[in-house]
């Protein structure tokens, strides 16, 4: 059996590109992309992706263990499954990305950039996901969980971001995030160029980006911290009932504004080490620059993904408001 992660790290593409066993058939679609289809009927088609940012290793390790357990029959495959390691070159070098953030390349975003290995990869991943869903059972419900870890610490360590879509968010998706003991869920207010927005908007999948702690090198992750999300992913693959939640109720936030860096003098009014979900009160200055300041207009708001070092014209953070319980 070819190991999923090893095939990427060693750049050794499997000799057999497809095959089957007693339970399912499998086909390698690309480097770090494999499709598994059970012999019996199924009601769900699920994409699990990690490594869109190459230094976010814990989710990659989770997918490797799931891959091994499915092939060893210690995890029963009762759904059609596409496993994706997103950015092989960045995974091999331990970098977030090589030239440009791949999670801003989807929904055709790669077309606005100079061609590179990563733009080509983003385009192919879009194609693989579309083909995966189109070739699956027409009545199967579609899901996509894109797994990440964050650059900075967070007051709410684990959270999901749901793309802004026209259709209502799927109840099973929301229930699975709750069962995974995530601390929070964030609802976007505008379209994006993320992998999960692509699968939601272009493939009609119930999709989410999951942030599961902080990025660490391979071998330095404490996977015991990811037991809850791992359990839920395995339950989804086996198509079994979701487990109960074991934490305080999940908190819900909505994005009310994006902070855009427009000028060279742009500054955020918080320390560089400030965690995600840092709090601002009404009247607080969140960010300053010559052309526009950002001030908290609500009683309490929080900031997500603050980054003063982005290029001009890019998002330097999200302003969140907590939704009523």
UniProtKB/Swiss-Prot annotation:
HAMAP family: Arg_catab_AstE (MF_00767)
Catalytic site positions: 211
Annotated Pfam families: AstE_AspA_cat, AstE_AspA_hybrid
Binding site for Zn(2+): 53, 56, 148
Manner of cofactor binding, per the entry note: Binds 1 zinc ion per subunit.
Catalytic activity: N-succinyl-L-glutamate + H2O = L-glutamate + succinate
InterPro entries: AspA/AstE_fam, AstE_AspA_cat, Aste_AspA_hybrid_dom, SuccinylGlu_desuccinylase
EC number: 3.5.1.96
Lineage: Bacteria, Pseudomonadati, Pseudomonadota, Gammaproteobacteria, Moraxellales
GO BP: arginine catabolic process to glutamate; arginine catabolic process to succinate
Role of this protein: Transforms N(2)-succinylglutamate into succinate and glutamate.
Organism: Acinetobacter baylyi (strain ATCC 33305 / BD413 / ADP1)
UniProt family annotation: Belongs to the AspA/AstE family. Succinylglutamate desuccinylase subfamily.
Cofactor (UniProt): Zn(2+)
Entry keywords, A to Z: Arginine metabolism, Hydrolase, Metal-binding, Zinc
PANTHER family cross-referenced by the UniProt entry: ASPARTOACYLASE, SUCCINYLGLUTAMATE DESUCCINYLASE
Name of the featured protein: Succinylglutamate desuccinylase
Pathway: Amino-acid degradation; L-arginine degradation via AST pathway; L-glutamate and succinate from L-arginine: step 5/5
A GO term, aspect molecular function: succinylglutamate desuccinylase activity
């Amino acid at each position: 059996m070819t190991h999923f992660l090893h095939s990427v790290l060693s750049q050794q593409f499997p000799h057999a590109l497809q095959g089957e066993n007693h339970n399912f058939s499998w086909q390698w679609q690309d480097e770090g992309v494999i499709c598994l289809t059970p012999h019996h009927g199924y009601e769900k088609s699920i994409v699990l992706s990690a490594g869109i940012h190459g230094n976010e290793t814990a989710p990659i390790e989770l997918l490797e263990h799931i891959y091994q357990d499915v092939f060893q029959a210690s995890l029963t495959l009762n759904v059609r499954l596409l496993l994706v390691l997103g950015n092989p070159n960045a995974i091999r070098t331990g970098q977030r990305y090589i030239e440009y953030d791949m999670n801003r390349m989807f929904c055709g975003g790669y077309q606005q950039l100079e061609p590179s290995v990563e733009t080509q990869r983003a385009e192919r991943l879009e194609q693989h996901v579309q083909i995966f869903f189109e070739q699956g059972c027409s009545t199967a419900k579609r899901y996509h969980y894109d797994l990440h870890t964050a650059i900075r610490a967070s007051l709410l360590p684990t959270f999901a971001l749901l793309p802004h879509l026209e259709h209502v968010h799927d109840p099973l998706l929301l229930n699975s995030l709750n069962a995974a003991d995530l601390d929070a869920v964030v609802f976007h207010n505008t379209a994006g160029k993320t992998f999960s927005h692509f699968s939601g908007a272009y493939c009609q999948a119930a999709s989410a980006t999951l942030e599961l702690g902080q990025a660490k090198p391979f071998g330095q992750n404490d996977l015991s911290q990811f037991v809850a999300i791992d359990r839920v992913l395995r339950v989804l693959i086996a198509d079994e009932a979701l487990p109960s939640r074991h934490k305080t109720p999940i908190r819900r936030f909505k994005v009310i504004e994006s902070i855009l860096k427009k000028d060279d003098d742009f500054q955020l009014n918080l320390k560089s080490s400030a965690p995600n979900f840092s709090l601002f009160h009404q009247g607080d200055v969140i960010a300053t620059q010559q052309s526009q300041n950002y001030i908290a207009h609500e009683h309490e708001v929080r900031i997500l993904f603050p980054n003063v070092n982005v290029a001009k014209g890019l998002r330097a953070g999200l302003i969140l408001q907590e939704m009523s319980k």
